[in-house]
Amino acid sequence: MAADDRHGQPMVLSRSGETMAEPLPLCHLNGKLLPLREARISPLDRSFLFGDGVYEVIAVHGGYAPQLAANIARLARSLGELKIRNPYQAGQWAELIRELAAANGGGDLYVYLQVSRGSEYGRNHAPLPDVEPTVFGFCAPLPPTPPELYEQGLSCITALDTRWARCDIKSVALLANVLLRQQAIDAGAAEAILLRDGWLTDASASAVHVVIGGEIRTPPRSHQLLPGTTRLLVEELAAAHGIPWSSAAVSEAALRGADEIWLSASTRGVVPVTRLDGQPVGDGRPGPVWKRMRALVEASWVPGG
């Protein structure tokens, strides 16, 4: 077990080498704040029986959630696509998130929200029309990023994208993602970068960006990949700061020949990939475009940044 983080929570190492903090003590369940250890959800909840629900992860830096509006919009879209009743308006979601973060001491943390279709008395593939959604949320400290990750980059593998056909929905049904991440770990890598029919989609738990000839390229939005909020931030920052960027399909050959590859995620910002399937990416070191984007992304974590 590693040292405690600033919240006093024990830090443990996952099999991928990442640090993971234990959840903070208070959670939200169906409109109430209560100790996480006292939270109870029915075993007949559809998220447990069917994976019938959606989730969202909101990064909070020093009490500030820079992508809050994008997170709430994506949550609402996922609920709408699954025809799960959205129990709150956007402002109510924002207040719930702020209240939960503040109740756990604020600072640098993430809020995990999960909304299931709800609990029925029985197991029915077709849900009953009057089922009430279950809303659950907890917090945990943001995992610290080891300095060597930024200095040396990540090693990744490529893998066949075996996820379902609606990856644009942030569904709690993540078995394929779990198996793909496990495949990467078993190969001694940090993450699996996914290919479908010879084209780049996502990584198992991140969005993927490549740099070719100084231009950032990210696969276009479709049902085959999640509309990542940090990916959206990268697009906005590139446009605002004159960094060449395009939403363009990336072939396997282009991926393997890229000058730079990065991963982006809410809890880590942007991180460089320096080895892919055992081969160096570019010159095998984090690249200059990534270094500039990292600085811009991390500046955005401060209000007014």
What are these regions (language model features)?
Residues A2-E99, Y121, H125-G305:
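Helix-start/capping segments and mature chain N-termini
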Residues I97-G107:
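Signature of the catalytic double-stranded beta-helix
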Residues G106-V115:
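Ordered, amphipathic secondary-structure segments that act as subunit-interaction surfaces
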